[in-house]
């Protein structure tokens, strides 16, 4: 009987060695040990436990807040004063939804700085017309009330107006013009494909909690790079920068997201996004002592919009508290 077990173990060993080239080492080890114990009657081993590695204690805490068992959650944050950064699924793509409006506004404002357009010029709102999902490549719109560009930027950011966004998107030349601006700014992993009317009309084709659609998508890392660069005036004049950041500070949407759990003495400039089974918030947190944090949080799934918003609020507070209590001398950059 023992010799039969030994022969069986030998065959298992040879089979395991032969499979190592095509299967993961950990899987081979676990399966081999299980069969070994079964063949020789030895005591089963405790399963191996591997602790995830984090670049800092703050990143570990954010990862706990962003645990995504009920849908993907992507987070990126950067302390503009110290360089401390956090990235949880920061390189994974998420639907931009209305957070893309930051880039659309920036594209128009770059044109203002170059003398192509004026903030005082008026353009009509583009109102969506009734149409069936996917019935046309571009959703039909019609001209509405005319407003000057300064007003359009304010309501497209602060109130997330879709007709105002599409008005300026048409002025700059459509989605490709915005992609070109992002490319000039050196921002990778940013892709705008559709106007807002089409995006909203055709929403629901995929579930972002389990499916990555590269159309109209970005990564949390890319959006943190974008908002930090805009805040620091890297690509726009001071006047244009102030127009955009000022509109973000006046945002009235997403009160249950980034600002929800932050102290009242913290200034928040942000832009929200919402589509089928996804909620997001991207912006700047400015602390009373002058420290400034750029952050982007994209949440999918979680069972409800309220649950996603609660996750976003909790993550934002975790980042805020981590920056407050972490000494710069203990910071480990996670770039």
What role is predicted for each listed range?
Residues 27-60, 65, 170-171, 175, ...:
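Structured C-terminal helix/loop/strand segments within mature extracytoplasmic catalytic/sensor domains
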Residues 45-52, 87-95, 137-143, 151-155, ...:
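Second-shell loop/turn segments in exported
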Residues 83, 95-125, 295:
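Active-site SXXK
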Residues 72, 145, 153, 166-227:
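Mid-domain, small-residue-enriched loop/turn segments at the edges of structured enzyme/sensor domains
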Residues 110-129, 175, 179, 237-240:
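Short, well-structured active-site flanking segments
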Residues 12-21:
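Bacterial N-terminal signal peptides
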Residues 2-13:
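Bacterial N-terminal signal peptides that target proteins for export
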């Amino acid at each position: 009987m023992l010799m039969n077990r030994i022969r069986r173990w030998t065959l298992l060993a040879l089979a395991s060695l032969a499979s190592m080239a095509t299967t993961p080492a950990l899987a081979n080890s676990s399966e081999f040990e299980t069969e070994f114990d079964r063949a020789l009657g030895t005591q089963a081993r405790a399963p191996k436990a591997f602790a995830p590695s984090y670049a800092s204690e703050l990143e570990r805490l954010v990862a706990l807040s962003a645990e995504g068992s009920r849908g993907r959650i992507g987070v990126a944050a950067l302390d503009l004063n110290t360089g401390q950064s956090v990235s949880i699924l920061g390189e994974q793509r998420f639907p931009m939804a209305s957070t893309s409006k930051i880039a659309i506004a920036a594209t128009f404002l770059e044109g203002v700085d170059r003398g192509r357009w004026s903030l005082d010029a008026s353009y009509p709102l583009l109102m969506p017309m009734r149409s069936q999902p996917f019935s046309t490549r571009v959703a039909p719109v019609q001209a509405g009330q005319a407003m000057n560009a300064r007003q359009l930027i304010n309501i497209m950011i602060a109130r997330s107006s879709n007709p105002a966004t599409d008005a300026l998107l048409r002025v700059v030349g459509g989605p490709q013009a915005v992609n070109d601006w992002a490319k000039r700014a050196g921002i990778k992993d940013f892709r705008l494909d559709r106007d807002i009317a089409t995006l909203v009309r055709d929403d629901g084709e995929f579930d972002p909690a389990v499916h990555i659609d590269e159309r109209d998508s970005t990564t949390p890392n890319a959006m943190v790079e974008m908002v930090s660069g805009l805040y620091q005036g890297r690509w726009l004049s001071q006047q244009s920068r102030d127009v955009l950041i000022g509109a973000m500070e006046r945002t009235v949407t997403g009160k249950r997201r980034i600002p929800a759990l932050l102290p009242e003495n913290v200034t928040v400039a942000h832009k929200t996004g919402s589509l089928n089974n996804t909620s997001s918030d991207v912006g700047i947190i400015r602390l009373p002592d002058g420290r400034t944090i750029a952050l982007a949080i994209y949440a999918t799934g979680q069972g409800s919009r309220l649950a996603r918003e609660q996750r976003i609020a909790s993550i934002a507070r975790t980042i805020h508290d981590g920056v407050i209590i972490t000494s710069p001398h203990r910071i480990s950059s996670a770039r």
